[in-house]
Amino acid sequence: MDITNIKIKKPLLLVETDKNIVKGNYNNFSAKIIKTAEDSNYKIGDIIYTDANPFVPFVLDGVTFENIYQINETTIKGEIV
């Protein structure tokens, strides 16, 4: 299933991680942004970090995408430059 044509609204971001996030507390967990709202302060390809707890698995039409999560921009702690 392709997510390139879906539209999302600020403050939602879609991010990709290199591993599945399980319950627990990860400090400064990083992820790459793969989809933003048009008016987002972030851009595709930015690497951000935050605690893993705000990451919610991305589900579309009943399909859960592996290693893709939705996150609210307001929970981001910083950007890795």
Regions found by a protein language model. Name each.
Residues M1-V81:
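Compact, glycine-rich, soluble single-domain proteins
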